[in-house]
Every structure is written in structure tokens, then in C-alpha cells.
């Protein structure tokens, strides 16, 4: 049975790609990802890569849990392993964000290292564990997944200040509005 997060992520991605194609007449594009190998690459032109989502290859995120001896919330793995894609700009109510996605196998390894670093910082500051999902325009805030409850939060980096955006990642993805703008 397909995980609900996988289905919700695929549905959001379809809406994102459709909006991009309607507004720009082409696949989503990125200057920041130009020249970086990925199964997503459709073609490159003028220092820009055009991409489409591609299915993940069965990777997991268990390295994060093993590194810190914690059990990851079950919603996290499908969010990052369902597909390869470029980061996607979106809006949730008034908050604009860049949804973090995995571009390649190498990018997945980098993501895991960054998540471990995030969790180590939280442990050092005695904060409950979260895992980042998206960056925001405000460099001090990010959208995260609470590893204990599975809620999606707007979190101030290094602070206990957190606001619940959605009770589940599936609910969050269903309410997220795609913005056909280049990320990065």
C-alpha cells in the first residue's frame, strides 16, 4: 500500500509541474542545479537545467536514526525518498517556502548529513527533535516535521518557538499551494 505522504507529495508535485508548464510552457527549471547530475534532468540550456520528477529508487533514511540512536517519524522517509525532484517553491497561507527535495543519490546523502547536524544542534540546545522540510525567506525560520508527533511546524532556528501549521505532513501537502517560481 502506498504511504499517504508519498501520494500527497506526488499530487503536490503534479500541481507544481502543471502550474509551471501553464505559466512558462516548459518543465520546471533551475539555474542553481545546472550541471549537477540527476535522474530528473530533461535537458539543459543557457546555464539552466529543466527537470521533471522521477521515482525514487528505494533508498531509506535509516542512517539518520542510527547516527543519533533515535527512531524517525514514519512520515519523514516517504517525503524524501518517494521521488527525485528539484526544490519547489510553495505557499502555505502567508508563508512562502522552498520545499526541500532530493536531486540525486549524492544529494540524499548530503540531506542525511544536514538532518543529523540539525538534530545534534537541537539535542545540544535541549529542544525536542524536528527534521527540516522547507526553508523560508526568513533565514531564521524553517518548516519542520516534529519527530515526536508528526505535526508540521514553523520553527525559529535554535529556539523553542514553534507554531503548528498542520497536524500531519499529508494534510500540510494537501493544503500547500505551488508557486511556479525558480528556487535558488
Swiss-Prot record:
InterPro entries attached to this UniProt entry: Syd, Syd_sf
Main location: membrane
Keywords: Cell inner membrane, Cell membrane, Membrane
Annotated GO CC locations: cytoplasmic side of plasma membrane
Subcellular location: Cell inner membrane
UniProt keyword Membrane, yes or no: yes
SS bond partners: none
Highest taxon of source: Bacteria
Topology in membrane: Peripheral membrane protein
Claim: Transferase is one of the keywords in the record: no
One Pfam assignment: Syd
Function: Interacts with the SecY protein in vivo. May bind preferentially to an uncomplexed state of SecY, thus functioning either as a chelating agent for excess SecY in the cell or as a regulatory factor that negatively controls the translocase function.
Similarity section: Belongs to the Syd family.
Protein's recorded name: Protein Syd
Organism encoding this protein: Edwardsiella ictaluri (strain 93-146)
Name of the encoding gene: syd
Amino acid at each position: 500500500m502506498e504511504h499517504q505522504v508519498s501520494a500527497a507529495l506526488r499530487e503536490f508535485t503534479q500541481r507544481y509541474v502543471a502550474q509551471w508548464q501553464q505559466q512558462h510552457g516548459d518543465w520546471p527549471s533551475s539555474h542553481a542545479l545546472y550541471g549537477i547530475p540527476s535522474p530528473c534532468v530533461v535537458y539543459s540550456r543557457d546555464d539552466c537545467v529543466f527537470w521533471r520528477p522521477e521515482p525514487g529508487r528505494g533508498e531509506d533514511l535509516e542512517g539518520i536514526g542510527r547516527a543519533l540512536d533515535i527512531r524517525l517519524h514514519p512520515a519523514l522517509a516517504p517525503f524524501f525518498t518517494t521521488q527525485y525532484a528539484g526544490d519547489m517553491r510553495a505557499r502555505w497561507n502567508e508563508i512562502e517556502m522552498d520545499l526541500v527535495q532530493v536531486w540525486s543519490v549524492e544529494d540524499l546523502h548530503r540531506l542525511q548529513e544536514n538532518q543529523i547536524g540539525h538534530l545534534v544542534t537541537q539535542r545540544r540546545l535541549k529542544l525536542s527533535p524536528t527534521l527540516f522540510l522547507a526553508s523560508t525567506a526568513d533565514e531564521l525560520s524553517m518548516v519542520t516535521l516534529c519527530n515526536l508527533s508528526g505535526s508540521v511546524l514553523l520553527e525559529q532556528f535554535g529556539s523553542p518557538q514553534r507554531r503548528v501549521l498542520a497536524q500531519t505532513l499529508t494534510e500540510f501537502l494537501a493544503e500547500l499551494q505551488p508557486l511556479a517560481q525558480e528556487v535558488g
